[in-house]
């Protein structure tokens, strides 16, 4: 009899704890959404910041249910966010260094490893743009396309391609996934590690031909290569530069300024979003606020399952695994997503995580 009462007591306490945690999550979400105030600043409470990852980890993706139906752009908020970001960086300028920034033979320190240096090669210098590739460019609608497997079976391809300007990340493949991700690419990032992971480190002619073919599809698009972040990828950058020059590819290369990543991080930290290093997706959204009137995000989903409990791949195009909540990760993607979700609900951007309506 005593053991039965003990089990009932434990069960009752467990139910009360679940009820309390559910109420806590609801209150936290409600509080966060009321914190987007003056000057476009995203002011998150200290308690939310400190508990954010814990809450997200326990509740999973279920706390991020938002609707795209009835979504409306909040133009005044968009303008205030742009104005606030301009206090930290000017994307038109910081999106790339230009030829006049360096001369061949100059030695610079890596952005995230100041003890190590890089020599500006002749090939690299020859590919630096004369002026910013985003100078005086403005667009009504932009799509920033992440690489989450949430895009698979979304049917978002046509909607993505309908935007005036499409930004993609890490040279992700598009042709074989066109129905879900589209093919239009106006600005595409490429971490040096992509050379090894997706193109075999250019070990043979077939790998090099595959890479050249991929870049030839970009035509006059901007290829954004973060060449100055950390030591280790410099040989890949040089190989890429050499192939572009040898094959006379028409892609427009860009290499982010030495201050960009710290300026972007500074903006979010000042607005009480304690990121480590901004992910490529968050970085692209931050830059896009400078030249896009309306920003739509696709392929952003830093969780292993969707809202229905179905497994979601880290990348839509490969089987790479990622531990979203690992302290060893340089990013805090769930926290970034939580922030973007708040901005969606306030009309600053549109975040699509489900199926797209047929056009």
From Swiss-Prot:
Annotated CMP-N-acetyl-beta-neuraminate binding sites: 147, 170, 279-281, 301
The UniProt transmembrane annotation reads 8-20
Active-site residues are 331 (proton donor/acceptor)
Catalytic activity reads:
[N-acetyl-alpha-D-neuraminosyl-(2->8)](n) + CMP-N-acetyl-beta-neuraminate = [N-acetyl-alpha-D-neuraminosyl-(2->8)](n+1) + CMP + H(+)
Question: Which InterPro entries does the record cross-reference, listed alphabetically?
Answer: Glyco_trans_29 (IPR001675), Glycosyltr_29_Sialyltrsf (IPR050943), GT29-like_sf (IPR038578), Sialyl_trans (IPR012163)
Coiled-coil annotation: which residues?
none
- The species is Mus musculus
Compartment annotation:
Golgi apparatus membrane; Secreted
The set of disulfide-linked cysteines is 142-292, 156-356
Q: What is its EC number?
A: 2.4.3.-
Report, as the record phrases it, the tissue specificity of this protein: Strongly expressed in lung, heart and spleen and weakly in brain.
Cellular compartments per GO CC: extracellular region; Golgi membrane
Q: Which PANTHER family match?
A: ALPHA-2,8-SIALYLTRANSFERASE, CMP-N-ACETYLNEURAMINATE-POLY-ALPHA-2,8-SIALYLTRANSFERASE
Instruction: Supply the alphabetized keyword list.
Output: Disulfide bond, Glycoprotein, Glycosyltransferase, Golgi apparatus, Membrane, Secreted, Signal-anchor, Transferase, Transmembrane, Transmembrane helix
Descriptive protein name: CMP-N-acetylneuraminate-poly-alpha-2,8-sialyltransferase
Mapped to this chain, the residue ranges on the Lumenal side of the membrane are 21-359
List, alphabetically, the Pfam families matched: Glyco_transf_29 (PF00777)
What the record says about family reads: Belongs to the glycosyltransferase 29 family.
Q: According to the record, which residues are glycosylated?
A: 50, 74, 119, 204, 219
Q: What role does this protein play?
A: Catalyzes the transfer of a sialic acid from a CMP-linked sialic acid donor onto a terminal alpha-2,3-, alpha-2,6-, or alpha-2,8-linked sialic acid of an N-linked glycan protein acceptor through alpha-2,8-linkages. Therefore, participates in polysialic acid synthesis on various sialylated N-acetyllactosaminyl oligosaccharides, including NCAM1 N-glycans, FETUB N-glycans and AHSG. It is noteworthy that alpha-2,3-linked sialic acid is apparently a better acceptor than alpha-2,6-linked sialic acid.
Gene (UniProt): St8sia4
| Molecular function per GO | alpha-N-acetylneuraminate alpha-2,8-sialyltransferase activity
A biological process (GO) annotation for this entry?
A: ganglioside biosynthetic process
Q: How is it modified after translation?
A: Autopolysialylated.
